[in-house]
């Protein structure tokens, strides 16, 4: 111990302060991703695969090569610019590239006017998907399982460049609702098979427009939004399910949507039913409901949760990958956010975590060992540490 203490060198200001002669900048590794069990290290000019056991890096492709391949193609699904003989938008870097196919050497490249599926082993173009072209789509949601792409243009929803809705101003489809409360951050939800799309439809025509000042342009402009003031009428939300194959939409038969919140949408693993947590406007009564994805009819109310002050559902249910009859429900019923194991009949099997600390996030599963991986504040509310929880 004495020798080790003598060998330790105390850091100097030159070591610690940026600009010091001996200051060492720690390498930043942004946007690391997984392709199956292989770690992907994206860069500006190159894309590397990293062996997680050895750390060995293997070059997959380069930005120059990808751009050469893409700019040499004119395909039936290409953008208007490409069809007219102009070059596609160039890939500027690999940081927003995704790898949603663990069993295929494909990557998803997001360009301003098109999504590209690219084979990085063969350096070949696989598929191109315009994501709105000149219409400037937002809220883009791509399903690798079904190969469909959903997006919104202004207040309407499109799938594969076909209009799903044609609503007037005051009715918004495919976007986040309920002022982004209760864990809501998006408005479209693909089924696990990628053949059905659940989406929000929000009627806010009864809500009085509220003026906001946009100071972005040189001369400020008034931008009106519909904001439900306390004690006044709130917007009404419904949930639709669109089938790209038939191009038909079924809406859930939820009844009168007045003063009701429909939150935390999730799909059954087989895609035959849709789950959501309904909340009243007083926010003291929540219900977990299951709907038939073909008919939109209510199949069952699995459980209800009430509290004298409030309940605050923030997370959709999450099915166990090794047993589709069981799912994890998150609740603050004992004062802290914890995990509860339920079956699809609505029966509580057991509480998986407990204590005066929060489960912050479910990070994934270890299916072989029947474990769920979580981040929590168990050690300290100032820290976030990783834990594994045995489900069996």
Each PLM stretch: what is its role?
Residues 5-392:
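Beta-propeller folds
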């Amino acid at each position: 111990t004495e020798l080790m203490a003598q060998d330790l060198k105390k850091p100097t200001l030159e070591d610690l302060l940026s600009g010091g002669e001996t200051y060492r900048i720690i390498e930043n590794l942004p946007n690391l991703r997984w392709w199956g069990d292989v770690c992907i290290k994206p860069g500006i000019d190159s894309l590397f695969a990293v062996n997680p056991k050895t750390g060995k890096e293997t070059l997959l492709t380069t930005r120059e090569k990808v751009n050469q391949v893409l700019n040499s193609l004119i395909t039936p699904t290409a953008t208007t610019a490409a069809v007219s003989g102009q070059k596609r938008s160039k890939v500027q870097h690999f940081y927003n590239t995704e790898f949603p196919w663990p069993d295929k050497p494909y990557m998803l490249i997001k360009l301003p006017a098109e999504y590209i599926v690219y084979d990085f082993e063969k350096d070949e173009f696989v598929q191109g998907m315009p994501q709105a072209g000149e219409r400037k789509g937002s809220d883009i949601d791509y399903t690798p399982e079904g190969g469909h792409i959903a997006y919104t243009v202004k207040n309407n929803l499109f799938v594969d460049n076909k209009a799903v809705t044609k609503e007037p101003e005051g009715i918004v489809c495919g976007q986040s609702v309920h002022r982004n409360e209760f864990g809501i951050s998006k408005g479209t939800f693909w089924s696990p098979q990628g053949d059905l799309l659940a989406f929000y439809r929000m009627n806010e025509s009864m809500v009085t427009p509220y003026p906001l000042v946009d100071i972005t342009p040189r001369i400020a402009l008034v931008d009106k939004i519909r904001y439900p003031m306390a004690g006044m009428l709130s917007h009404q939300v419904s949930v639709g399910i669109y089938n790209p194959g038939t191009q038909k939409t079924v809406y859930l038969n939820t009844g009168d949507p007045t003063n009701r919140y429909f939150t935390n949408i999730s799909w059954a693993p087989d895609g035959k039913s849709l789950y959501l947590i309904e909340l009243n406007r007083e926010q003291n009564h929540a219900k977990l409901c299951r709907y038939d994805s073909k008919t939109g009819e209510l199949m069952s109310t699995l459980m209800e949760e009430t509290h004298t002050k409030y309940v605050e559902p923030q997370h959709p249910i999450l099915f166990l990958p090794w047993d589709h009859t069981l799912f994890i429900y998150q609740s603050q019923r004992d004062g802290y956010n914890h995990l509860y194991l339920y079956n699809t009949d609505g029966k509580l099997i057991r509480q998986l975590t407990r204590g005066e600390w929060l489960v912050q996030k479910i990070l994934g599963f270890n299916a072989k060992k029947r474990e769920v991986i979580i981040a929590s504040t168990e050690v300290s509310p100032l820290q976030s540490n990783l834990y594994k929880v045995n489900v069996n």
